Amino acid sequence: MVTEGKDSKVALEQSWLELLYPEFKEAYMQELSSFLKSEINEGKKIYPKGNEMFLSMNSTPFHKVKVVIIGQDPYHGPGQAHGLCFSVPKDVKIPPSLENIYKELEEDLGIPKPKNGCLLTWASQGVLLLNSVLSVEKGRAGSHALKGWERFTDKIISKINEKDCVVFMLWGQYAAKKAYSVDTSKHLILKSAHPSPLSSHKGFFGNRHFSKCNEFLNSKGISPIKWEIL
């Protein structure tokens, strides 16, 4: 799942591959790969599909990253996860957290609620939609936590931290802790409650992160994100 092809090349976009290839040689990634293969061999259903585990990076090359949104782990229901945090394929019902994200988007920028939950439009503009854990067993939220993904995605964040003027949109305590080492002197850190129905009224609604993000990007001479979903 981590590598593919007869030469065991990592199925990863070139700019990310150049940065992260050494990680795939580390023992923890070898152990993670063995774990995933073992789970599949035991007949367990793993989400997202293997070719979508790295969709966040494959959709948003390193040099294009302007914004980072951090999730915890993929949706564990059939057909939901496709490699982008909070996002689902176009033909899948919009999950509750994403419904609330859309509500805030409309309140903040006046953008009508999109008809689908696919966030590839954001990803293609430089919004890295990164889950901390990149796989999950069907029906078992958090089942692939502490298997190595967190260390891998920590490395991704550390590489992005080397860039300048990136916006980190951190929703909930988990995301805030994940990005604790980000250099606040050159990046914009936006924190609020998580958009889950359990916490959205505790500070997510009204956070105006979408407009604040674009205000920052504009101030740095960086083209803003068009948040409309196509």
What are the residue ranges of the model-derived segments?
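A polyanion-binding, active-site-adjacent surface
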Residues: 22-170, 174-177, 182-183, 188-191, ...
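Generic N-terminal amphipathic, Lys/Arg-enriched alpha-helix
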Residues: 7-20
